[in-house]
C-alpha cells in the first residue's frame, strides 16, 4: 500500500517473514515509490522495464533486480505476471555482520543480467525459482529452507559484486585474469628467448 504517494508499507500477515508473489500489483505501474525492505524482482519473460534511482533497466527472461531499502523505484512496463516479486526485511541480511558490511557494495550492482553460458547465473536463477516454489509447498520448516536459500542467493550475488568491483578497479586482478596474464607472459618469454629447436 502506498502512503503519501511515495512510501510503500507492507503487512507481514500471519507472521510470515517473506511476501512472495508471481505477479505484480498493477496499481504500482509507473508509480515512483520507496520502502524500508528488500525486494527481489525476477523477470519470467522479455520486455520488462524497471527504474531504480533514475536508472532504467530493461529486463529479459531470468534477469534479476534487487531493490534495497530507500531506493526510489518504479515498474514502468510489465504484464503483471511477467515479474515475480519477493519482499522481506533487510534485518534478515543485516543480522549477519559480514553481509551488513557488504550492503553498500551490493547496492551498487542491483542488476543481474542472465547469461545462459554462465553456470553461476543458472545457479542463482535456480535458487530463486526454488525459493518461490517453496512458499507454496507443504514442506515443514519451509521458511527456514527459504531463509537458507536466500542466504545462498546473496552469497553468490555478493561474490559477483566483489568480482565486478575488482574488474573495475585498476591494478586489481582476479585470479583468472592473473593466470591468463602469467601464461601470456610465459609464452612471450619463450618465443623471444628460445628461437632454436629444443633437442
Regions found by a protein language model. Give the residues of each.
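Generic protein-terminus/edge-of-domain signal
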Residues: 1-60, 77, 98-112
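Ligand-binding loop in jelly-roll beta-barrel domains
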Residues: 70-98
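DNA-contacting interfaces and partner/effector-binding or oligomerization modules
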Residues: 101-104, 130-134
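Glycine-centered loop/turn positions within well-structured domains
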Residues: 48, 73, 196
